[in-house]
């Protein structure tokens, strides 16, 4: 049975609905990025789904379509702030800022995951990137934005292979940490670091 990715958008059809997702909670280096997207129900872009289920090429194509056709915003919380406030609080902060950065104020904010927010407009949906088109669109924007940032950082610190691992704790990345030590962009509050 195919999931109706517009279920939540239809449920709240009388409201301006934004979807939010993040990229970068688990990596050992780099920022966490959240994106907020308000889709246009009259202009549905086909092929949008959870960014993890798309090829890099397809994500890039959909990124261009989403950013050209929908209201969207991003928020970036640095590795330094993650170390200060922890990854959960950094993720929640990024989500709140992304929603606030939209040039249209959402009345309902659908967020992937099970995080709790004090703002009652925020509704957390476990597995939301597979259940809501606006969250899935946000997952694409967040993932592409973060991957591009890590590609830029990889040019400065090529030994960590961030252009391939996006800062995640792959075998090669851990070996590079052991050999070269931490870069200025590693999260020092994470176990390996």
From Swiss-Prot:
<dbReference type="GO" id="GO:0004523">
    <property type="term" value="F:RNA-DNA hybrid ribonuclease activity"/>
</dbReference>
<dbReference type="GO" id="GO:0005737">
    <property type="term" value="C:cytoplasm"/>
</dbReference>
<dbReference type="InterPro" id="IPR022898">
    <property type="entry name" value="RNase_HII"/>
</dbReference>
<dbReference type="InterPro" id="IPR024567">
    <property type="entry name" value="RNase_HII/HIII_dom"/>
</dbReference>
<protein>
    <recommendedName>
        <fullName>Ribonuclease HII</fullName>
        <ecNumber>3.1.26.4</ecNumber>
    </recommendedName>
</protein>
<dbReference type="InterPro" id="IPR001352">
    <property type="entry name" value="RNase_HII/HIII"/>
</dbReference>
<feature type="binding site">
    <location>
        <position position="112"/>
    </location>
    <ligand>
        <name>a divalent metal cation</name>
    </ligand>
</feature>
<comment type="similarity">
    <text>Belongs to the RNase HII family.</text>
</comment>
<dbReference type="InterPro" id="IPR012337">
    <property type="entry name" value="RNaseH-like_sf"/>
</dbReference>
<comment type="function">
    <text>Endonuclease that specifically degrades the RNA of RNA-DNA hybrids.</text>
</comment>
<feature type="domain" description="RNase H type-2">
    <location>
        <begin position="15"/>
        <end position="193"/>
    </location>
</feature>
<dbReference type="GO" id="GO:0003723">
    <property type="term" value="F:RNA binding"/>
</dbReference>
<dbReference type="GO" id="GO:0032299">
    <property type="term" value="C:ribonuclease H2 complex"/>
</dbReference>
<feature type="binding site">
    <location>
        <position position="21"/>
    </location>
    <ligand>
        <name>a divalent metal cation</name>
    </ligand>
</feature>
<dbReference type="GO" id="GO:0043137">
    <property type="term" value="P:DNA replication, removal of RNA primer"/>
</dbReference>
<keyword id="KW-0464">Manganese</keyword>
<keyword id="KW-0378">Hydrolase</keyword>
<keyword id="KW-0479">Metal-binding</keyword>
<dbReference type="GO" id="GO:0006298">
    <property type="term" value="P:mismatch repair"/>
</dbReference>
<dbReference type="InterPro" id="IPR036397">
    <property type="entry name" value="RNaseH_sf"/>
</dbReference>
<dbReference type="Pfam" id="PF01351">
    <property type="entry name" value="RNase_HII"/>
</dbReference>
<keyword id="KW-0540">Nuclease</keyword>
<dbReference type="GO" id="GO:0030145">
    <property type="term" value="F:manganese ion binding"/>
</dbReference>
<keyword id="KW-0963">Cytoplasm</keyword>
<feature type="binding site">
    <location>
        <position position="22"/>
    </location>
    <ligand>
        <name>a divalent metal cation</name>
    </ligand>
</feature>
<keyword id="KW-0255">Endonuclease</keyword>
């Amino acid at each position: 049975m195919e999931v109706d990715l517009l279920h939540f958008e239809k449920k709240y059809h009388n409201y301006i609905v934004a979807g939010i997702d993040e990229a970068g909670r688990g990596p050992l280096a780099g920022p966490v990025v959240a994106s907020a997207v308000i889709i246009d129900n009259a202009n549905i872009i086909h092929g949008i789904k959870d960014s993890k289920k798309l090829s890099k090429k397809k994500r890039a194509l959909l990124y261009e379509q989403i950013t050209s056709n929908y209201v969207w915003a991003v928020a970036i919380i640095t590795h330094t702030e993650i170390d200060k406030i922890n990854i959960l609080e950094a993720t929640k902060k990024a989500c709140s800022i992304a929603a606030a950065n939209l040039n249209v104020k959402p009345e309902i904010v659908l967020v992937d995951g099970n995080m709790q927010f004090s703002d009652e407009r925020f509704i957390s949906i476990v597995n939301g990137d597979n259940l809501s088109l606006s969250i899935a669109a946000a997952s694409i924007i967040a993932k592409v934005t973060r991957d591009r940032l890590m590609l830029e950082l990889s040019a400065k610190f090529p030994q960590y292979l961030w252009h391939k691992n996006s800062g995640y704790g792959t075998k090669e990345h851990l070996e590079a940490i052991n050999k070269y030590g931490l870069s200025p962009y590693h999260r020092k509050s994470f176990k390996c670091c």
